A protein has these predicted regions:
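Short, intrinsically disordered, charge-balanced linker/junction segments flanking boundaries
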Residues: 1, 243-250
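Active-site-proximal cap/lid insertion segments
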Residues: 1, 6-169, 173-219, 232-240
């Protein structure tokens, strides 16, 4: 029977808690620094300089870097000072960690402990540039650990299509709701329409229709997806829909 399945992952959204296996694996990795990690926002307006997106100034010690509340209390005043906010918890332990069962905590704790020991012994002796590098690595380790799990589970879906002989008769569309800053301009999050955030992943596999390896550079938008699916299914598009089918580009 014909089917349409929407397979949605929350994993890349903050707070970033990879599964225990990925948490341990990625905590050992070191990632290359973006060229603009230490951007000084010269010749740009106030918004770029003051937005709460800076990795050094705005990533939370607990919520994002996995520093335990008791570690922060022991160290007293931490620099840079991170302004409290109202829309979420200030640490990842009162909002996320408390929901883990004892077995899960046992798997997470050795990695969390090693992060906290290093932080306690080294943080106050670091320069701001060194602190920025450390917080960037912690951000990447957890964010990309979550992304890796998404990749694994997308692979399970694609494997199922192969195993059930559905691959050649199934259109697969991989996309997201927006791009994301991974250290470019010293930022995390997504708020500004710079190139890194404005671009959104879009990969389509349509057997016997789309040539493998085809790259399209025309600008499209996510409001085009509904019309594209209708067009693929041979269904007339309602006149009150705003997007345009991408099929002619494919």
């Amino acid at each position: 029977k014909p089917f349409l399945m929407m397979y949605l992952h929350k994993a890349p959204h903050r707070p970033w808690w990879p599964n225990p296996k990925k948490f341990k694996e990625f905590a050992k990795k070191e990632f290359p620094l973006p060229e603009t990690l230490f951007d000084n926002y010269k010749n740009r307006g106030t918004a770029a300089k003051t937005a709460e997106m800076n990795i050094l100034k705005d990533l939370r010690y607990g919520h994002d870097s996995k520093i335990r509340p008791e570690t922060m209390e022991e160290m007293f005043d931490l620099e840079p000072y991170v302004q409290p906010y109202n829309w979420g918890g200030n640490d990842g332990f009162t909002t996320s960690y408390v929901r883990f069962n004892s077995e899960q905590k046992t798997l997470y704790d050795p990695v969390i402990d090693s992060i906290n020991i290093w932080f306690r012994n080294n943080w106050k002796g670091l320069t701001n540039k060194e602190k920025m590098k450390w917080k960037y690595q912690r951000y990447m380790q957890d964010y990309l650990g979550c992304i890796s799990s998404v990749d694994d589970n997308l692979g399970r879906v694609l494997d199922y299509l192969d195993e059930e002989d559905l691959t050649e008769n199934t259109i697969v569309i991989y996309t997201s709701d927006q791009g994301f800053y991974l250290g470019e301009h010293g930022w995390f999050d997504k708020r500004f329409i710079y190139n890194e955030s404005f671009k959104t992943p879009l990969i389509i596999r349509w057997p016997n229709k789309i040539k493998s390896g085809l790259k399209i550079t025309e600008m499209v938008q996510n409001l085009d997806y509904a019309q594209t699916l209708l067009d693929m299914a041979g269904i007339r598009q309602p006149s009150d829909m705003q997007g345009e089918s991408l099929v002619p580009l494919l």
